[in-house]
Amino acid sequence: MKVAVTGAGGYIGRFVVKTLVDQGHEVVAIDFVHQGIDERAKICDVNIFSGEPDVYEKMGCPDSVIHLAWKDGFVHNSNAHMDNLSSHYKFLRNLVDAGCKNISVMGTMHEIGFYEGKIDENTPCNPLSQYGIAKNALRQAL
């Protein structure tokens, strides 16, 4: 299976890429920084936030897309989270409109906010940071 991974050089992305390649998948790695990306993956220099409707084709029409890219993920109150929200949404809409059938978008514990105890898909979201608010808004918009 051909799998595109955005944020492929990031904190989680580099391990996702390695695991997928180890499992025999063809991996298209997308990131602004290529350092740390498994050499067996194909690097794709496409700007996923350009708003171009043909972004799926530029990625090589993968069978699946795992969207991990997120600027300033460790800076929880960065203005970038809200500033870039529409770009994330447009990127994902363009994938769907182009026919991509399998898309996974990484969420975060910051969507839940402060919560003690076990969480599951029914745990209410109460994000407290710009990061959590933006991630939650993207999930709700989709």
Regions found by a protein language model. Give the residues of each.
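N-terminal Rossmann NAD(P)H-binding glycine-rich loop of SDR-like oxidoreductase domains
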Residues: V3-Q23
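SDR active-site strand-loop-helix element
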Residues: T6, I30, V65-L68, I103-M109
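Rossmann-fold NAD(P)-dependent oxidoreductase module
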Residues: F15-T19, N94, A141
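Conserved glycine-rich Rossmann-like NAD(P)H-binding loop of the short-chain dehydrogenase/reductase
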Residues: H25-G36
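Rossmann-fold cofactor-recognition segment
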Residues: D38-G51
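Conserved Rossmann-fold NAD(P)-dependent oxidoreductase catalytic core, especially the SDR/UDP-sugar
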Residues: K90-Q130
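Active-site Tyr-X1-5-Lys
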Residues: L128-L142
